[in-house]
């Protein structure tokens, strides 16, 4: 805690004060000195110039020139150095620091090529969203995070008893395995390993020799004789291109050498092994040994300091690592004085590079061969520094102790270091090391979780079974530890203090572990090139080895990146496209932009799902804070540790199944394998290499996920590849501790850094001339911020010069004196320094990590303030304007300007504190805020959603005002005649109202408008974009938006003309002048009364708790009393009244008020010119009129109060201050909006800190509560300022102390974050099969919020207009809460008939705090009977005193308790309970077989399959007598047709059970097929059913009778993962449609039938019933895996029903669920939240997590506070501040898409609709006259008002809202499809869901061109009941029309595209088209549950004329899902 506070003070507070400079102990001395000197120069230089030289512009010019030169030089060098690193031209250079003796020792190798090294690329985030850390879902460890789980067991003596260990560890679990027991036993013995046979040098290994078994044998060299030091391949690394580390490697890879080496790693723990691994106290040091501890700088993803911006050197201080010296060796002390530039490392995930430890932890593998008969000793040394084993000048070693005859051996990795570029391209297919296609084992390293290869001990040439040997002087099977040398020298070594276990290599087959003394510290290793260990191992790395990193690390990191575990992507986008056969390692925590949970690990080592289940149980335990080892570690320990047990022995015979018996066998590929019985074997078979085998044959495919084990395809390589063979490791002293959630991925994926090669880069300073520069990118990034472009550099130099010029200009002007001169120079220096090294993260930065925009904030603001000071001073001096008095304030006087100048001057001097407190936003946010405020408060605009939209909106308003200004000026410049209004003024009024109406209807986002323009002007671009978009399933949303905007534009074209003409007529009359004394007050009173009734009284009566006194709404919707909503909400009378009053208010009352004020003011100005000139008065009138009218059109709920306050204040209270009603109204509207903000802020603050309901989330909250009392006065001042500037008031760290944040626009979140889906369309196939990406509840459930967003898009605007959410305004926030969906809805832009909103979905089952708050908003308070401390009860329907008091002290209120919205009801059943017993599984398998037979018989390719020769030949043996498929996956318990006699599946037994079903299915075919028992059809069905069941058994490992493997296999088949492993099934590859169209849908359909079996077990006994059920399900239901894009497409297309099998792998669960979705209408509670509460809490979260770097996942600011919904609101922030599972894009809802509102208002008007209405009216009149003349005959029903118009075109019956009677029967049936959100092709031929059309019906006669609608024979589809269907079925102009009874384009306003809907023609009797009882039963709900209201007044609600198409039954097979056939034919 203390170190974190110091870090915040140093990197946050101090850096903010200085502009970015602070002392960073983690950086090099050069870097700190450079920063200090630059900052001092920028501070002192202007100060000295001002103090020493006389003030003149010449000095200012010199100052600017010097600053420009310095900045240009620094920026140029920085830019060119980055370009140098990008080019990657490396100059090889000899190690200059190598000592003479070391050079002699390396003489033999000096000619080898040096490691050129590869420069690091700068990594940046793959996405803009850092990972989630705060969610309840993210306390997950991955398999490779074992390092963070392993404890340290530091024993105080050489011998410790197990009981002592357990007692010492307390409650922590210690896993003590047989290997540990061996270590404890052996630790008491100290015996030196005797002299071992020497190995002659020069023996070269034979590359053809095999690698040995990973658990049984060791790598061999040559004929079993270990080699000395001889040549090795010297393939250098190719240079980097464009700075990417993942570029192509050279033609040939570096050859690894020396397979017989032990692993040597330096240890970072202060511990040492004594003897054979006995535990030794590590703290016994000499008195002179220092013991520095870790520096405590724990960086997480929330710390975005300079260390995170690639400028950190060492995150830990030096530790003393004590290791044993080799026997006989003297270890001289050496200093750890490594050049800091070699240790410069980043620690920032967000800066784009891995963290400090990530790059610092490469393993170095050294060692030498061991004689055949000896078990080689283990050298375990672990460095934790990048400068690992670097050469340095140290005392020469004593070589006399080396055994004679030995020469120094070469290192394991020589020459050009093997893949030193540890960072590989994120998306590359091949990481460098993995390109060798090697199989690897990964040790769980402590802080790095990296792989370490453990080469095997050497073995004799004989390839027989391994014998356990003891070293010299030891008995067989006993390990003899060496003695510890007496005079071990201990030297300090830099190390990490995070290691919790040592990873030791051990002999897999033998039960003994031989350990040599550990190598000494780094100094000893580096200083003794000639020293040899007891086993003949050199303890020194020659120079080449120092440069050679471990070969495994780069590939490990590359794979993790490739799997998405490492959050970085290289700067350059070039990536290799290679194929690799390497099985990818487990990714730790997959990062989804969705913010969903990390993907759990797949089953490792080819394990069956049981281990996967175990893995997830381990995760669940870790989540519940139980100290349990994660399953992956359990698995590794059981597999690896137990093999060291003494019971492992070779099997005595074939039947030996005793514990530890090892059997050998050959698999089908000829690979020799071993299998060990019992725990020692771990249940897995291991490959055993033999003499002469290829190395590839010995590799074990550890990561195979198929049911059969197979070898990896490792290509033939040299013996060096043996290093990469798997090798078990021992995890010593394992103990689990809890992993803090804030550990970033980059810190859990640490890799030990290799020793960096000393190389230089070519720096081209002139064309053709270069010099060598020895530097690296990380050091440069630590030194200076990177600027990527030339223009950015030029802009930075220019900005720094401008800062210097303007600052010095103010100094020359004399604005500052005394100490303020120095303060101003400090401000100048901070602004300039931020252009070189900015504050990261800044207090105003909305994101973690490096924010490049922030770097420009200070200088830009400084320039603006300086210009403002200079301008105000000039204006005050010149006084160009005469002073004006407005509302008692004198404006434009000299004192006014000077006062403003002084305020700006003081503000500029306070810049360091302003930026420390974060009171100024970053530049782009400030620009957007200013433009939005000007547009909203000056011109009545709507909110902006981005800086671009703000610019567009303000430009549009300025153009409109400029156009109107000319008319207004011309009208008031000429004198007016008495009692007359000039025509020009009337024209101005007409244009003003019309343009205000049009602007209020347009969105501020021009994207859709531009797409319309582009489609008209540039159709080729549109076609190109469409072709690109066809790759994914089509999204109907963009086209629907374009259609809606097109309708609005066409409607406005008509309505604006009408409005302008009417307004002109009214204004031209003299009504406003003649009645100006009376009319104004009448209009004010009318507006006030209507507004009060509409916006106060009605909403209060409709609230859940009216006035917080009544317990029920007075005006209840029809659904209020329903327990379960059955249909769409009914339109109530008070909703119609509310909408009608709003219409009258918007379009009649307020335009009249504004026109009256305009006319009166203009008349007054013309008659009596006032203090304003005419030009100013015309401008004021234009702007005020535009603003007031647009505000009235957009947001009428707030207008009546503004008008009332204006009248009261300026007509009665202060009439002398009035400047005319129009200007008064304009000013009061601005003032009222600020007062509303202030009111909301005060309510939030008082509610939050009310002492009787304070909820302290932490101890800090309790501590800060008393300090809030003296803070109250300051708090009120802050509230006033924040209300004035629209800034949030945020609680500091969630406490009761509030501080003001920076100004934000209405869209107050600055990052455009929205959730990206994770499904099979955007993930790799291998991850789909192995890891099932996104298989967690959050990712899978996010689709329901996406569907909810689409539903709201159709209905939200209309529902708001109908008053169903109460009063609303821009910026309001609502919470929608139902049983499982909890979403936060932000209203951003509120226009006239449009709403732009964003929805944020929370977790279904969230944290404890979230559940408490959900309970608070969903539970009722009606039952509360308390009054103070007693319970007297309450009056009927009235709240008790306590409940009423409590509801008033909440920051939220329930506005509707029954808001009906279309969505999906989700039912999930646990699949385990439904398949627990064998009988239930047998039912499923039987339905599986029947479904396969059904799909075979229905397939159109059946004839092709039956005639296929290959298929017939493969199935011919099936018909032989006595044939049975005896696969072990078949059993009597699950296969109904199992043949006991033949012990398998035979054709006769199959026919005995399924022949009747086959014959029935064949009989339903149109073409007859042979159906005999031995016919090709039956044989094909038999073959496919056997294949399908074998695939299920193979996937589920059905040898086991347990349920989990069965579910695993069922889920694998359900998602399409078919593994055809048997040669007998390969005939299916003759046509893949056999799998795609038969077997795959069969397993899905079987699951649905199995579900139905529980409701009616005997329903499907008859073949006809089963056949019809499958056919109905096939057409009505979409059955798909949730990862399939078809699933998302089906949901977004509003499919009625869906089914899926979900495998949930969350941290707390691992189970299979059957998910059933049914589309229906859901009931939500609508809770309106105080918008300032949301703004304040979000601002507080941002400040706490980004700037204050609070990493605590259980921080107090997210604990539940029911009065403010603190947890729910904070959870909905953008990730990583919050953790919503879905964030929608900004979505616009239009009123025209609401069907009920359109029915109420008639819809938009267009020219085409008007023309059609006129023609129809004429035709109707003509027919009526003709019928009247023909002896009084009746007119056709179709022409009597019920048949034409909109209703005839509607694709729905006119029945608007079903009554309970006619809707009662529909509860059992799935609802008909709702809004037509996408193309919904039908599966049938007609496609419209009706019987074949009656062709004799005459189509309606339509004059004019034919309608652009479906053909006359194509009738309405019941699957499209919503409004948008009307948009698609229209006339040539494609527009709506008004309702028929309203005159314009009534129901007859549209051409009929099918038969008239009003009734059948007279010539036709009503037809009963019911096909069958089933059909009619299906049709009934389709008819009675339509959403559309009755559109024609002549038809009573709830009824339809007989024979209307609405009465037509819907055949069952036609009621199809919207996704249609493409959704049912999935691709696998």
From Swiss-Prot:
Residues that span the membrane, as ranges: 33-53, 54-74, 793-815, 819-836, 852-872, 880-900, 903-923, 946-968, 980-1000, 1053-1073, 1078-1098, 1244-1264, 1280-1300
Major subcellular site: membrane
Compositionally biased intervals (Pro residues): 198-208, 1890-1921
Comp. bias intervals (Polar residues): 427-437, 488-497, 1978-1987
Positions of the UniProt region annotated as Disordered: 96-116, 193-239, 263-625, 1845-2028
Start-end of Low complexity biased regions: 444-459, 1966-1977
Residues with attached carbohydrate: 95, 319, 1770
Residues modified as Phosphothreonine: 129, 370
Family matches, as InterPro entries: Pecanex (IPR039797), Pecanex_C (IPR007735)
Database matches in PANTHER family: PECANEX (PTHR12372), PECANEX-LIKE PROTEIN 3 (PTHR12372:SF4)
Name this polypeptide is given: Pecanex-like protein 3
Natural source organism: Mus musculus (Mouse)
């Amino acid at each position: 805690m203390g170190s974190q506070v110091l870090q915040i003070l140093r990197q946050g507070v101090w850096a903010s004060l200085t502009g970015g400079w602070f002392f960073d102990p983690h950086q090099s001395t050069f870097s700190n000195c450079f920063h200090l000197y630059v900052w001092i120069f920028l501070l002192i230089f202007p100060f000295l110039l001002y103090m020493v030289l006389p003030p003149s512009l010449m000095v200012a010019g010199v100052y600017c020139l010097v600053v420009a030169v310095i900045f240009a030089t620094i920026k140029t060098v920085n830019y060119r150095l980055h370009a140098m690193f990008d080019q990657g031209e490396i100059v090889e250079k000899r190690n200059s620091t190598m000592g003479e003796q070391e050079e002699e020792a390396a003489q033999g190798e000096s000619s080898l090529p040096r490691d050129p090294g590869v420069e690091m690329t700068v990594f940046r985030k793959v996405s803009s969203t850092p990972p989630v850390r705060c969610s309840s879902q993210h306390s997950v460890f991955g398999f490779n995070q074992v390092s963070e789980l392993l404890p340290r067991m530091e024993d105080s003596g050489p011998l410790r008893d197990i009981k002592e260990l357990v007692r010492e560890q307390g409650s922590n679990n210690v896993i003590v395995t047989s290997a540990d027991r061996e270590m404890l036993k052996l630790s008491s013995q100290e015996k030196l390993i005797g002299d071992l046979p020497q190995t002659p040098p020069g023996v070269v290994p034979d590359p053809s020799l095999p690698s040995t078994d990973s658990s049984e044998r060791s790598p061999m060299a040559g004929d079993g004789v270990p080699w000395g030091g001889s040549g090795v391949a010297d393939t250098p690394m190719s240079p980097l291109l464009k700075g990417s580390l993942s570029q192509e490697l050279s033609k040939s890879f570096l050859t690894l050498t020396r397979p017989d080496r032990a692993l040597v790693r330096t240890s970072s723990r202060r511990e040492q092994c004594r003897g054979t691994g006995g535990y030794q106290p590590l703290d016994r040091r000499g008195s002179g040994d220092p013991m520095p501890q870790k520096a405590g700088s724990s960086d997480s993803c929330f710390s975005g300091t300079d260390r995170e911006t690639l400028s950190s050197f060492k995150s830990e201080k030096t530790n003393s690592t004590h290791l044993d010296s080799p026997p006989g060796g003297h270890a001289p002390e050496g200093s750890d004085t490594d050049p800091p530039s070699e240790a410069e490392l980043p620690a920032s995930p967000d800066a784009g590079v891995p963290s400090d430890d990530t790059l610092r932890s490469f393993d170095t593998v050294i060692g030498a061969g061991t004689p055949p008969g000896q078990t080689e000793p283990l050298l375990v040394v672990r460095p934790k520094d990048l400068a690992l084993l670097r050469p340095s000048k140290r005392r020469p070693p004593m070589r006399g102790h080396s055994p004679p005859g030995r020469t120094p051996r070469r290192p394991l990795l020589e020459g050009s270091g093997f893949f030193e570029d540890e960072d590989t391209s994120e998306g590359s297919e091949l990481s460098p090391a993995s390109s060798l296609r090697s199989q690897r084992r990964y040790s769980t390293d402590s802080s790095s979780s990296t792989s370490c290869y453990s080469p095997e001990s050497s073995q004799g040439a004989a390839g027989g079974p391994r014998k356990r040997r003891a070293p010299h002087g030891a008995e067989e099977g006993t390990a003899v530890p060496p003695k510890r040398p007496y005079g071990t020298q201990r030297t300090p070594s830099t190390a990490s203090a995070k290691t919790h276990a040592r990873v030791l290599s051990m002999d897999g087959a033998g039960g003994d572990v031989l350990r040599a003394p550990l190598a000494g510290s780094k100094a000893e290793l580096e200083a003794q090139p000639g020293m040899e260990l007891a086993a003949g191992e050199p303890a020194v790395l020659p120079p080449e080895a120092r440069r050679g990193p471990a070969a495994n690390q780069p590939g490990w990191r590359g794979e993790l990146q490739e799997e998405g575990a490492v959050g970085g992507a290289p700067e350059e986008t070039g990536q290799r496209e290679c194929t690799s056969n390497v099985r990818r390692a487990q990714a730790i925590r997959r990062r989804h932009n969705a913010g969903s949970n990390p993907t759990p690990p797949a089953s490792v080592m080819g394990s069956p799902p049981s281990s996967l289940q175990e893995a997830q149980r381990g995760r669940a335990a870790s989540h519940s804070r139980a100290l349990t080892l994660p399953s992956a570690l359990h698995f590794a320990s059981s597999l690896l540790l137990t093999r060291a047990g003494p019971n492992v022995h070779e099997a005595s015979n074939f039947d030996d199944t005793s514990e530890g018996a090892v059997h050998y066998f050959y698999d089908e590929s000829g690979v020799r394998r071993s299998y060990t019985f019992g725990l020692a074997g771990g249940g897995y078979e291991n490959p055993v290499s033999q003499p002469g085998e290829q190395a590839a044959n010995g590799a074990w495919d550890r990561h195979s996920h198929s049911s059969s084990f197979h070898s990896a395809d490792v290509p033939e390589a040299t013996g060096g590849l043996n290093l990469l063979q798997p090798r078990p490791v021992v995890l010593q002293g394992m103990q689990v501790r809890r992993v803090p959630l804030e550990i970033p991925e980059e810190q859990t994926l640490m890799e030990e850094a290799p020793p960096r090669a000393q190389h230089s880069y070519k720096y081209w300073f002139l064309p053709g001339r270069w010099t060598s520069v020895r530097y690296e990118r990380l050091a440069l990034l630590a030194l200076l911020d990177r600027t990527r472009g030339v223009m950015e550099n030029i802009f930075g130099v220019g900005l720094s010069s401008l800062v210097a010029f303007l600052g010095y200009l103010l100094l020359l002007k004399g604005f500052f004196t005394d100490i303020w001169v120095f303060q101003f120079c400090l401000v100048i220096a901070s602004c300039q320094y931020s252009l070189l090294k900015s504050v990261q993260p800044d207090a105003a930065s909305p994101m973690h990590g490096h924010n490049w925009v922030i770097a420009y904030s200070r200088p830009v603001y400084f320039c603006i303030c300086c210009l403002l000071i200079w301008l105000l001073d000039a204006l005050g001096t010149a006084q160009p304007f005469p002073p004006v008095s407005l509302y008692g304030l004198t404006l434009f006087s000299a004192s006014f300007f000077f006062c403003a100048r002084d305020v700006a001057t003081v503000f500029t001097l306070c810049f360091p504190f302003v930026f420390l407190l974060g009171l100024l936003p970053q530049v782009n946010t400030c620009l957007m805020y200013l433009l939005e405020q000007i547009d909203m408060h000056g011109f009545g605009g709507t909110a902006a959603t981005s800086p671009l939209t703000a610019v567009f909106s303000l430009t549009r308003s300025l153009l409109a005002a400029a156009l109107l200004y000319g008319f207004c000026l011309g009208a008031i410049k000429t004198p007016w005649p008495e009692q007359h209004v000039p025509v020009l003024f009337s024209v101005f009024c007409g244009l003003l109202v019309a343009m205000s109406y049009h602007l209020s209807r347009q969105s501020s986002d021009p994207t859709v408008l531009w797409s319309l323009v582009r489609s008209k002007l540039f159709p080729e671009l549109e076609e190109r974009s469409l072709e690109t978009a066809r790759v994914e399933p089509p999204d109907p949303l963009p086209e629907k938006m374009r259609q809606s905007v097109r309708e609005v534009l066409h409607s406005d074209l008509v309505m604006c003309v009408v409005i302008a003409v009417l307004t002109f007529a009214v204004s031209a009359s003299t009504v406003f002048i003649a009645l100006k004394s009376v009319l104004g007050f009448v209009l004010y009173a009318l507006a006030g009364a209507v507004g009060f009734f509409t916006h106060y009284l009605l909403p209060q009566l409709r609230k859940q708790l009216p006035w917080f006194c009544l317990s029920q709404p007075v005006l209840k919707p029809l659904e209020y009393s329903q327990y379960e909503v059955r249909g769409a909400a009914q339109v109530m009378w008070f909703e119609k009244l509310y909408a009608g009053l709003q219409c009258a208010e918007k379009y009649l009352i307020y335009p009249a008020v504004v026109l009256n004020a305009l006319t009166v003011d203009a008349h007054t100005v013309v008659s009596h010119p006032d203090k304003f000139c005419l030009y100013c008065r015309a401008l004021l009138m234009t702007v005020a009129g535009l603003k007031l009218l647009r505000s009235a059109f957009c947001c009428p709920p707030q207008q009546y109060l503004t008008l009332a306050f204006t009248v009261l204040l300026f007509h009665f209270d202060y009439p002398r201050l009035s400047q005319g009603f129009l200007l008064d109204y304009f000013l009061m509207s601005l003032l009222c909006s600020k007062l509303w903000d202030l009111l909301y802020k005060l309510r939030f603050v008082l509610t939050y800190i009310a002492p009787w309901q304070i909820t302290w989330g932490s101890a800090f909250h309790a501590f800060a509560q008393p300090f809030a009392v003296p803070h109250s006065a300051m708090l009120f001042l802050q509230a006033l300022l924040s209300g004035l500037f629209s800034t949030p008031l945020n609680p500091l760290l969630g406490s009761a102390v509030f501080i003001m944040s920076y100004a934000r626009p209405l869209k107050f979140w600055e990052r455009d974050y929205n959730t990206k889906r994770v499904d099979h369309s955007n993930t790799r196939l291998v991850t789909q099969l192995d890891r099932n990406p996104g298989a967690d509840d959050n990712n899978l459930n996010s689709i329901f919020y996406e569907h909810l967003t689409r539903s709201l898009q159709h209905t939200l605007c209309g529902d708001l207009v109908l008053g169903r959410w109460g009063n609303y305004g821009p910026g309001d926030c609502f919470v929608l809460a139902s049983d499982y969906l909890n979403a936060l809805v932000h209203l951003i832009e509120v226009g006239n008939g449009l709403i732009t909103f964003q929805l944020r979905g929370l977790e279904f089952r969230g944290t404890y705090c979230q559940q408490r708050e959900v309970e608070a908003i969903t539970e009722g308070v009606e039952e509360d009977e308390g009054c103070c401390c007693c319970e007297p009860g309450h009056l009927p329907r009235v709240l008790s005193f306590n409940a009423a008091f409590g509801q008033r002290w909440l920051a939220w209120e329930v506005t509707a308790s029954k808001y009906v919205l279309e969505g999906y009801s989700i039912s999930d059943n646990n699949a385990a309970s439904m398949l627990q017993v064998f009988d239930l599984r047998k039912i499923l398998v039987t339905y599986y077989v029947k479904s396969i037979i059904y799909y075979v018989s229905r397939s159109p390719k059946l004839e092709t399959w039956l005639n296929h020769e290959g298929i017939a030949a493969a199935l011919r043996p099936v018909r032989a007598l006595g044939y049975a498929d005896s696969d072990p996956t078949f059993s009597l318990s699950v296969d109904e047709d199992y043949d006991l006699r033949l012990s398998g599946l035979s054709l006769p037994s199959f026919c005995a059970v399924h022949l009747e079903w086959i014959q029935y299915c064949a009989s339903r075919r149109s073409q007859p097929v042979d159906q005999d028992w031995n016919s090709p059809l039956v044989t094909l069905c038999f073959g496919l059913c056997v294949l399908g069941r074998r695939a299920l058994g193979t996937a589920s490992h059905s040898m086991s009778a347990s349920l989990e493997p069965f579910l695993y296999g069922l889920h694998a088949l359900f998602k399409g993962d078919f593994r055809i492993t048997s040669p007998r099934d390969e005939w299916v590859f003759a046509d893949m449609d056999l799998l795609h169209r038969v077997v795959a849908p069969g397993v899905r359909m079987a699951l649905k039938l199995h579900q139905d079996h529980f409701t009616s077990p005997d329903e499907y006994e008859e073949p006809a019933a089963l056949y019809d059920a499958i056919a109905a399900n096939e057409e009505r239901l979409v059955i798909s895996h949730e990862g399939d894009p078809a699933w998302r497409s089906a949901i977004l297309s509003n499919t009625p029903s869906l089914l899926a099998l979900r495998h949930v792998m969350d941290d707390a669960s691992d189970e299979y669920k059957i998910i059933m979705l049914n589309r229906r209408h859901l009931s939500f509670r609508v809770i309106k939240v105080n918008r300032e509460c949301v703004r304040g809490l979000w601002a507080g979260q941002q400040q706490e997590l980004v700037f204050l770097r609070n990493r605590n996942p259980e921080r107090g600011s997210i604990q539940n506070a029911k009065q403010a919904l603190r947890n729910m609101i904070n959870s909905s922030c953008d990730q990583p501040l919050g953790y919503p599972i879905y964030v929608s894009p900004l979505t616009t809802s239009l009123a025209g898409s609401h069907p009920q509102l359109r029915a109420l208002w008639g819809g938009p008007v267009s020219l085409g609709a008007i023309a059609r209405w006129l023609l129809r009216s004429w035709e109707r009149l003509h027919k009526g006259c003709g019928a009247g003349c023909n002896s009084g005959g009746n007119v056709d029903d179709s022409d009597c008002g019920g048949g034409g118009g909109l209703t005839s075109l509607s694709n729905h019956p006119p029945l608007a809202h079903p009554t309970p009677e006619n809707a009662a029967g529909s509860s059992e049936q799935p609802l008909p499809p709702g809004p037509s959100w996408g193309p919904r092709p039908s599966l049938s031929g007609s496609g419209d869901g009706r019987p074949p059309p009656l062709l004799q019906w005459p189509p309606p006669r339509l004059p004019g061109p034919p309608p652009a609608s479906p053909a006359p024979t194509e009738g309405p589809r019941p699957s499209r009941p919503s409004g948008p269907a009307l948009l698609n079925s229209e006339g040539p102009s494609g527009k709506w029309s008004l309702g028929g009874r309203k005159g314009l384009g009534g129901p007859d306003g549209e051409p009929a595209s099918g038969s008239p809907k009003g009734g059948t023609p007279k010539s036709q009797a009503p037809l009963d088209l019911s096909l069958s009882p089933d059909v009619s039963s299906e049709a009934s709900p389709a008819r009675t549950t339509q959403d559309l209201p009755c559109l024609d007044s002549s038809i009573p609600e709830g009824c339809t004329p007989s024979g209307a198409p609405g009465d037509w039954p819907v055949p069952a097979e036609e009621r199809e899902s919207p996704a249609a056939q493409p959704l049912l034919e999935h691709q696998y």
